[in-house]
């Protein structure tokens, strides 16, 4: 697991690919939880909730980087 991507998610940074409309972020309600789950959105639809480790692996596979969500902006909380 990429520690950098995990820390970015834990700090509220949204990982995005605006061209493909794919986003992964940690909602504010998950901050400080023992097993944080991230939200994956694709094409404006919520595609699922992922444990942090799976979210990081998906972000690496999709080549997501810090970006701007169309509704949330730059940060998820």
Describe each PLM feature range:
Residues 16-57:
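Acidic, low-complexity, intrinsically disordered interaction modules
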Residues 1-17:
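Negatively charged, low-complexity tracts enriched in Asp/Glu with abundant Ser/Thr
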């Amino acid at each position: 697991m990429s520690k950098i991507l995990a820390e970015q998610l834990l700090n509220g940074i949204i990982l995005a690919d605006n061209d493909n409309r794919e986003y992964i972020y940690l909602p504010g309600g998950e901050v400080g939880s023992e097993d944080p789950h991230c939200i994956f959105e694709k094409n404006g639809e919520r595609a699922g909730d992922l444990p942090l480790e799976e979210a990081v692996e998906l972000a690496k596979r999709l080549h997501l980087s810090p970006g701007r969500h169309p509704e949330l902006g730059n940060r998820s909380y």
